[in-house]
């Protein structure tokens, strides 16, 4: 896992070059907006239980067959496993947001997840719907102006949304 800074250094080192001015500018921007990033991660983390439970509740309301007898989330144990998995995805998205790079999400959470779900008979499309619901809630947290560093958070909100999109695509 590399953060955005480590990745730039590794790339420049592999090429045997100094860090380019464009790379330096991108890292400088990332550093200058660090407080927004910290505020976003703190907000998502503080709201994590609500984000996860609301996404699951909404998914089960839209797809009641999942919690009906014979459904993939039938029994409390399976619902708990669903909530746990959604929480893990959300947690790794906060790590990626903090690092400014998706590699931790990809390497430690998403790689092999589709195959695992297929082997267990978990409907990936339903998981993707729940992840999209979490995305909507998390992006709302990022865009909430209360208690965050003043400034435009649209680029950061787009970045956070892209991590959710990446996770949703990984399970279908």
From Swiss-Prot:
Q: Which domain of life is it from?
A: Eukaryota
Q: Where does (2R,3E)-phycocyanobilin 1 bind?
A: 82
Q: Which Gene3D superfamilies match?
A: Phycocyanins
What InterPro entries is this protein classified in? Answer: Globin-like_sf, Phycobilisome_asu/bsu, Phycobilisome_asu/bsu_sf, Phycocyanin_b
**Record carries keyword Transit peptide:** no
Location in or out of the cell:
Plastid, Cyanelle thylakoid membrane
Q: Which residues carry this modification: N4-methylasparagine?
A: 72
Recorded hits in Pfam families, A to Z, give: Phycobilisome
Alphabetically sorted, this entry's keywords are: Antenna complex, Bile pigment, Chromophore, Cyanelle, Electron transport, Membrane, Methylation, Photosynthesis, Phycobilisome, Plastid, Thylakoid, Transport
GO annotation, biological process: photosynthesis
| Protein modification | Contains two covalently linked phycocyanobilin chromophores.
One cellular component term from this protein's GO annotations in UniProt? cyanelle thylakoid membrane
How does the protein associate with the membrane?
Answer: Peripheral membrane protein
* Residues the entry annotates as binding (2R,3E)-phycocyanobilin 2: 153
Which family does the record assign?
Belongs to the phycobiliprotein family.
Please explain the role this protein plays, according to its UniProt record.
Light-harvesting photosynthetic bile pigment-protein from the phycobiliprotein complex (phycobilisome, PBS). Phycocyanin is the major phycobiliprotein in the PBS rod.
Subunit: Heterodimer of an alpha and a beta subunit, which further assembles into trimers and the trimers into hexamers. The basic functional unit of phycobiliproteins is a ring-shaped hexamer formed from two back-to-back trimers contacting via the alpha chain subunits. The trimers are composed of alpha/beta subunit heterodimers arranged around a three-fold axis of symmetry. The phycoerythrins also contain a gamma subunit which is located in the center of the hexamer.
**This protein's name:** C-phycocyanin beta chain
Species this chain originates from = Cyanophora paradoxa
